[in-house]
Every structure is written in structure tokens, then in C-alpha cells.
Amino acid sequence: MEKFLVTLSTGAASIAVLAVLFTVPSLYNTINEVHDEVLDGVSVFRVETDSAWTEMMDIQITVTPPTKPRVNPFNSIFRQKRQTFSGLPAWCQCEPTKPTCPPGPPGPPGQPGAPGTPGAPGPKGDDNTATFAPLTCAPVSQDCVKCPEGPAGPAGPEGPAGPAGPDGQPGAPGNAGNPGSDGQPGAPGDNGQDGAPGQDGQPGAPGQDGQRGSGAPGGPGAPGNAGPAGPAGQDGAPGQDGQPGPAGPAGQDGAPGNAGSDGQPGAPGGPGLPGNDAAYCACPPRSAVFVSRH
């Protein structure tokens, strides 16, 4: 058993050493390749940035006007330092603004452009030549669907009472009761109908002439019954128009209409106004490129 373990350990150690011997050179070569690629990229970037900086300095020199020199109030007291840049002017020539400064605010939007001209109609499409097999539907069964019986439902509520049964047989007559006492006299009956009027009697003998009375006149008699209604009068003139009534409540909003078709796209607007300066960037120190240009 010990021999087997020693042999296994030795074999594993040998394999590990061989793997290290093959892996280390490969890693070394990979690291060197990456190092060379990084150096090449840095060199190319440096060449491009130097070329861009030189072009920017040329544009700055030809476009930007020179600034006025600063007046030092101590020039009359202290001795001025000699200028080492003999080819440069006596004032500060600032370099162009670095791109680290924040840009200005965007300009206002331009006016909408005129609608473009409609495009030419496209060519006629090809006819559809694809054919499809006829669709066949499975026959529909007209048999009733047989569902399995469900479980028994709960007991229903008690029903209403049934109808009354038939009358029973009449019972035997009872014994005659004792005669009752006399009742109270009843109320008088209604008056009978009036009889027919009798025949007119013979006219009486004329009476003696009466004497004119000398008493005061009697009072006015009771007012008579109202007479029949008179004919309807003519229609009166139409009355004036009444004041207008208050405004009624506003009706409910109607349903929204269908959306209209999209309009033609407008032409591109004009260029916006230049934005304001966001911040002031101090002038960087003079570089050797600027000195070499002068």
C-alpha cells in the first residue's frame, strides 16, 4: 500500500513539473506580445495627438487676435526679467480652449421646414403564385354529450302545505234548545213613497177687495240664483316675452374622434444660435510647439 502511494505521489509531482515547464514560457511569450501591442498603441496615439495639437496651434495663431499686454505696476521699481522667447510678442498669446471646458447651452430650435415632395409611386407587385391545399374539416358529431352522473345534491327545503281535504259527513242533529226571551222593539221603518197628486179643485168664489195697506215697505228679498254663463269674450292681446331663463348645465363630453393622419415631415430647421460661454478656462503655459512656430 505504501509503495502505491509513493508511486502515485511521484507521478503527480512529475506531471505538475512538466505542466509548469510548458506553461511558464507560454505565459512569458503572451506577456511580451501584450507589452509590444501596448507600446505600439501608445506610440500611434502620441503621434496623432502631437499632429492634432500642432494643427490646433496653427489655427489659433492665424485666427485668434493677440491680447493686450498686462501692465505691471512694479516695473518702475523692480528690474524686469529677461525674455527668453525673443521671437514672441510682448503680450500673452493664449492657446485654444481645451475640450475639458463644459459646452454652452444648446441654441433655440430652428423654424420648421417646408414639407418634402411626395415620392414616386412604387412598381406594381408580383402576383401571388403560391397555392395551398384545400382545407378539410373533421365531421362534426351530432350525438349528445353523455356526462357522468354527479353526486346526490343536498336535501331541498320543506314544501308548502297541501290543499284542504273534503268535508266530513254531517253530524247528528242536536237537541232543541230552550226558547229565548223577547227581543227589543226594532227601529221605525223608512217613509213610504209620496202618493200621486190629486185632481185640481174647483175655483173658489172671488174674494172681497182688499184695502191698501199703509205699512212700511218690506226689506229686500233674498238674491236670486245665478244666471247662465255668458258667451266667451274675445282673445286678449299677446303678452310680452318673459325674461330668458338661466343657462342649463353643460352636457357631457362627446366621445373622442378618430385620430387624424400624420402630417408630412417638416424640412430641417436652420442652425441654432451660438451658446453662451459656460466657464472661463485659464490660459495654459506656453509650450515648445508655440515657440517653434515663431
UniProtKB/Swiss-Prot annotation:
Region of interest: Disordered: 100-133, 149-278
Summary of the tissues where the protein is detected: Expressed in hypodermal cells.
Biased composition annotated in UniProt, kind: Gly residues: 210-224
GO MF entry, a single one: structural constituent of cuticle
GO cellular component terms, semicolon-separated: collagen trimer
Ranges of biased composition (kind: Pro residues): 100-112
Region (Triple-helical region): 102-127, 153-274
Pfam family, one: Col_cuticle_N
Annotated S-S bridges: none
GO biological process terms held by the UniProt record: larval development
Biological role stated in the UniProt entry: Nematode cuticles are composed largely of collagen-like proteins. The cuticle functions both as an exoskeleton and as a barrier to protect the worm from its environment.
SUBUNIT field: Collagen polypeptide chains are complexed within the cuticle by disulfide bonds and other types of covalent cross-links.
Name of the protein this chain belongs to: Cuticle collagen 10
Gene name for this UniProt entry: col-10
